[in-house]
Amino acid sequence: MKFRSLIKKTSNWLTATPERSLDNAYKAALKIKEIEDNHFGGKKVSKENADYGDSVISYFKTEVNGYLQKINMGLGVFKTSRLFLNISNIQELPQERPTERELQKNATTAAIIFEKLEFIDQVASKYQSRDTQEVYNGSLVLAKESSQDKETQTLDNKSTNQTNSKLSNNNKISSGQNDSRLESASQKTGVLPRSFINTLNKIKQEIDPKSGESEEQVLNKYRKSRLRTALSIKFILLLIIVPLLTHQLTKTFLLTPIIHQYFQNHEQVVFINKDLEEEAFEELSHYEEILRFQGLIGLREPLTDEEVEEKVQEKAREITEEYRAQGIDSIGNVFADLFSVTAFAIVIVSSRKEIEVLKSFLDEILYGLSDPAKAFLIILFTDMFVGFHSPHGWEVILEGVARHFGLPENQEFNFLFIATFPVILDTVLKYWIFRYLNRISPSAVATYKNMNE
């Protein structure tokens, strides 16, 4: 009874998650609206709409930013939980036609949700839409320029100068001109090291006579970089949390009860493959041998054959329940992983702009590393997955995957996989080093060769 009560409470809490998270976001929007009405005449919280000092404006902006973060988190939880509940409700279609009262209740609930979402969008759009759109546009410009650079790069200095002049003209038009010029430099080929060129660019900016414009550009660059980092981290967490949460919810509340009911209706089904059956027989035989051995050496009173058989039967029941539960868990993992992959694909397909932002964020981090750091990461990756000791690691991974899905271990497949996949991976890595890294950072390749030798 306690377990059923706990399951019911958990189910009710999960069902109420969308409404609860939307209410939190709505309350945060009300707080922002209250600050606007009481101190800024119902307008946006900014210095232009009030006669306060810098300290007061900074205080109100800090409050508004805190409420905006609550709104973003609440809406994120609202969308994610609604997606999970919709997936779960597909399996629970009503058998009878809903009554007029139920339809009216659903319509009222939907109207309230729409009203709250509209109010939240009306309040939050004053503070988020412009900056977010600038980050999206800047990331798209970076992606386009990066692809153009990769297509037009040559070792000839004349071609390099033409590419640089073309990029500088495009940067005058785009809003993120300095960001694009500095970040795309990591993807160009030049005679001088990239770090030396970046240092010269920084000195050039610092001695620029248009100091006021440069300061404004630095502030805009910092704001865009901060927002891009926040969006990238949020998207990475979403890519991790959504599949994991989908796996746990579908497995716990949808798949496990169905599979458990099937095993109850088919009591003759105990093992889902021969390997588990052999493990169970070995465990039972080992238990019987322990009982007889302990009786022979005096660790316990000698047991008669009837007593030994009784204890072995009890152990056999325990083993049956244990391996039946293991089979239920393995079958549930197969279908739960399919749901997780589907959820992951939905997030990827519906987040094109976020992917562009994440790509520019990762490029900035990876290509901004020092040459020894790049060489260290390459050596660590190669030694771990394609090195001398990698076959042992791949064996452990393959055994874990087989046990996760309840599949029997196949030594021939394991040997074939270990003999081919690391070789393919090593070939792809060497091609990447030769094709891209050798042009982007030749010193990193030289450092990698020296460290590898």
Curated annotation (Swiss-Prot):
Coiled-coil residue spans: none
Region of interest called Disordered, as start-end residue ranges on this chain: 147-189
GO molecular function, one term: proton transmembrane transporter activity
Keywords per UniProt: Cell inner membrane, Cell membrane, Hydrogen ion transport, Ion transport, Membrane, Transmembrane, Transmembrane helix, Transport
Membrane topology: Multi-pass membrane protein
Chief location: membrane
Family annotation (Pfam families): CemA
Compositionally biased region (Polar residues): 154-163, 176-189
Membrane spanning stretches: 235-255, 330-350, 377-397, 413-433
Cellular component annotations (GO), alphabetically ordered: plasma membrane
Compartment list: Cell inner membrane
Tree of life domain: Bacteria
Compositionally biased intervals (Low complexity): 164-175
HAMAP family membership: CemA_PxcA
Family, per entry: Belongs to the CemA family.
Protein's job: Required for H(+) efflux immediately after light irradiation to form a rapid H(+) concentration gradient across the thylakoid membranes. Together with PxcL, contributes to transient H(+) uptake following dark to light transition.
Name of protein: Proton extrusion protein PxcA
Species: Crocosphaera subtropica (strain ATCC 51142 / BH68)
